[in-house]
Structures are given as C-alpha cells and as structure tokens.
From Swiss-Prot:
InterPro entries: Aldolase_TIM, Methyltransferase_A, rRNA_lsu_MTrfase_RlmN/Cfr, rSAM. This is Probable RNA methyltransferase PA1839. Its cofactor is [4Fe-4S] cluster. It comes from Pseudomonas aeruginosa (strain ATCC 15692 / DSM 22644 / CIP 104116 / JCM 14847 / LMG 12228 / 1C / PRS 101 / PAO1). It is an enzyme of class 2 (transferase).
Amino acid sequence: MRSQDLHQRLADLGAKPLHCGRIVRAWLQGRALDACTARQRAEDFLPLGVRHGLPQVAAELEGIARLHSEHPASDGSSRLLVELADRQMVESVLLPRGGLCVSTQVGCAVGCVFCMTGRSGLLRQVGSLEMVAQVVLARRRRAVKKVVFMGMGEPAHNLDNVLEAIDLLGTDGGIGHKNLVFSTVGDPRVFERLPRQRVKPALALSLHSTRAELRRQLLPKAPPLSPEELVEAGEAYARRVDYPIQYQWTLLEGINDSLEEMDGILRLLKGRFAVMNLIPYNSMDGDAYRRPSGERIVELVRYLHSRGVLTKVRNSAGQDIDGGCGQLRARATQGTAERRIPARQA
C-alpha cells in the first residue's frame, strides 16, 4: 500500500480531503484513526460511512508492519525488529532525544564490506507506508521528532518510495524538514531529485575514504563518483537548502584511520558547509575489521576539529544488544531460506 492507495481507500468510504488529512495525521501520530480534537468529536466531523469503515482501514494499516521484538540498550536507545506483512524483517532504532532510524530495503545491494545488511544482498524494496509504519510503531513507545533513513538498505535504490515517505512525514507527520535525513552512498539521481521535492531533507553522504580506490573496495557497488565529485555535489545541495551535509566515516583500524586520510578530509571539507561524523566500527561475528582505540579516536577528532572541520563521534546505537545495522535481523532469520533480487531502479 502506498500513500495514494490509503487516500483512495478513505475516499471510497466517503472521506473528503479534510477528513483524509485528519485520519492520516492521527495514524502518523500513533493514535486511533477516529481520534478527536479538543474542540470536535469524531462523530461531529467524520461522515457516517467513514466512521463505519475505519475499523477495517485500521486493521489494514496494522497489518502493514508489527513489532516482532524490542531490544532496549544501556545507552537509552532501543532496537525494534519489525515484521512486515510478508514476514520479512527490518530493523528500526529508537535513538535518545527523539530520533528514529528506519530501514528502506530488506537487505541491500551496495555490499559495503563493513555492513551486516549487505551480506544478504537485496531481498526486496520497502514500501513508503512500510517505512512510515516504522515511525508509527516507534511513536507508540516514545515521541519521535527526527527520522533518519539510515537503517537497512540504500535509500537511493528505492527512491520513489523513500521520497514519498519523506513527503508524508514532513507534512502530515509534523516532522521538520531538517529533521528528516536521507543517507546515501552518493547516487547522482539523489542530487537531481532532492532539490525538486516539496520536502527537502537533510543529506548524509557515506564517504569512508578520500582515496577513490579504497572507497571502491569498501563500497564495491556504489556509483563511480570520486570523493571530490561526491563532496562537490553535496556542497551544492547544502547551499541550496541552507543546512550542512553530514559526511559518514566508519572508522576501521589500520584501513582509514591514518593521518594521511585525515589530511584528505581536511583537503575535501575545510571551508565546506559540512559536518564529519566519525563512526567507530561495530564488530560483527567472523569479520576481520576492528575499531581504533578510544584514545586514537579522540586524537583523530581533535586533529580534524582543530584544523577547521567540525567533527563528531557517532557511536552505533545499542552496541550491547547486537546494535550493528542488520545484526538483529540476521540473528532472527538465521537458518531460513532467502532469495536475492537485483536492485530496482527508481
């Protein structure tokens, strides 16, 4: 089901645009579809046919996604394993201070070598209302004021559905445009389409290395943009929407944590409208990668920050409960057969 399908479903019951707006807003806030306002009861506002049909609509919306399990962590985050209607699983993460990270695909075709999600390949796309349903489930647990499309999947490979979800959350969902974050490895279509949207989200770009060859090794199926081209495209978008690009850098000991790489970051980002997020690697079973020591991470942050690049450390939420992206899903689906599909282009 997509957004237009929901509106058509309500229209078939006799709902006018004003009625649809209230019903959709109630759902997006995690409330009952016939939730009244302080000044008006549902029976005084919604047509009889709509009121009679709402229980069935509510059941259909509940069937889009359900909470399979919740895993609170010591850092205040909570990982949600969400089961979709076809029994596929995706993850979303409730973050401290009102944030939520949602998944846009079941699996991923990019195949980043340090990501658990990429190991399964792409299984299927997540629909726009399946993304929104992750927000609804989260809002029933705590307030959500920021949504980052940074969970399982590459949003650029499911662009139509992601942009539709962003539009819905940025309008009827009541989330500020700067608090909607589109994360991508850097697909040219993103830079073409995002500036034309009614809701223009913040942008996070996966950099991970300033050396083109190493970046290709780390992100083997990412579009062939050089680090320089990626930063130029990001800067143009940042200046257009007037908020900075977040550059993502997963810190891998002995691979991309050298001073040579840090000098490359300074070369690319100094003077840019940008924030560098250093993300210490979250170890997975059976892999050869490690995060640098805490002392080394502090050293790198100080090196960049003191030379003019705003730098933050972003630890993966819920590290004590298999917090790496895709790890909960991998554990839940262990032993089940899965079929990979090629990425559907937007």
